């Protein structure tokens, strides 16, 4: 029996308005293994709740906006509705109200495995319910059945030059799939707006099914001499098939992929990739085009390059002081690095004010499976000394490690040393969040996003008027 999503115990103090992103959904179709059927019950129920909420509180002020927020990238500005996840500064990400440790405990796992299946987090993100084994297996079966790539996309990937970045190839392939868009076809036929989500759902399921194959072809073309990608095994889950297609048959690597794909899947709606997907989708571009645009955002170094920068940082340490260092030597090295005007990559976060739970679960994986790996031991020692150094320096609001501080080391351990491909892995994972958000955006009938912009002169006038 599915477990209904819990409500976070966080309230906006004035007016005591609950944060809607993780409110419980109806469970009218619980037990069904047909995700689309389940959503067909939940979406109308949620829309009725939103309608009632807006009727009562539509004019309630939840935040004032100052000039610095406008110039500062709208950071922390409350301006979006995202139902799938909430980032708590103290607890980290919650997927539909569930923390990462709760997801690790409650979500179905592969037979003999210990990490949650991405198919299960997809069900949770879409419905707010922890799926049963049967519901999770139904997603696996459906993705395996939808995984074939059209010939033109395979040919395009095979004809890309070797020096074209893997993210550029990934973005192009996703966009090229849009000739199969059911959403675009339905819109052209003039289907009712209330049905948009159904076609967004179909495109999202198709795209999720195909992304591992797209990513694997890119990987093998660039780094494995163009060797053929293995066919989908209907007996394997999404992550196991992805691992095999990449050329990694170690069951433990498949376990790492399950963990990686789950913990990177969603992170609210304001990050660059999720916001881009939402923005482009709000113009009623189909999910292929919206997600392709999202991946262009993820390709930016400020969003998707962080785990690579951590590895460069670690290799720099090893190159200068080796692996036979003392804690004191490492402290001296970090201080020297900071005093030269540089930062410690993988530490700090725009929202979080504690160690990222996504870091912690990767650390637990490493402690269990690769405790004696030299790079992992370096990461562990940095975890021990760096927060204190950053606090003493006095510049960091959050001196604790984030998810990017660890993921690259795990991939390196299993032999995936091609850092330029890591963002593609991130993209495959982030599809789970972006596309579940997109389905709900269409289901809720969210409008075209169109904020008001001002020139600096216009803001000066507004500021002067506000002071009168």
Curated annotation (Swiss-Prot):
Pathway: Carbohydrate metabolism; tricarboxylic acid cycle; isocitrate from oxaloacetate: step 1/2. One of its GO terms (cellular component) is mitochondrial matrix. One of its GO terms (molecular function) is citrate (Si)-synthase activity. Citrate synthase is found in nearly all cells capable of oxidative metabolism. SUPFAM superfamilies: Citrate synthase. It is an enzyme of class 2 (transferase). The active site is at residues 303, 349, 404. Keywords: Mitochondrion, Transferase, Transit peptide, Tricarboxylic acid cycle. Its main location: mitochondrion. It is found in: Mitochondrion matrix. The lineage of its organism: Eukaryota, Metazoa, Ecdysozoa, Nematoda, Chromadorea. It catalyses: oxaloacetate + acetyl-CoA + H2O = citrate + CoA + H(+). Homodimer. It holds the Pfam family Citrate_synt. Its EC number is 2.3.3.16. NCBIfam families: cit_synth_euk (TIGR01793), PRK09569.1 (NF007128). GO terms for biological process: carbohydrate metabolic process; citrate metabolic process; tricarboxylic acid cycle. Belongs to the citrate synthase family. InterPro entries: Citrate_synth-like_lrg_a-sub, Citrate_synth-like_sm_a-sub, Citrate_synthase, Citrate_synthase_AS, Citrate_synthase_euk, Citrate_synthase_sf. The keyword Metal-binding does not apply. This is Probable citrate synthase, mitochondrial.
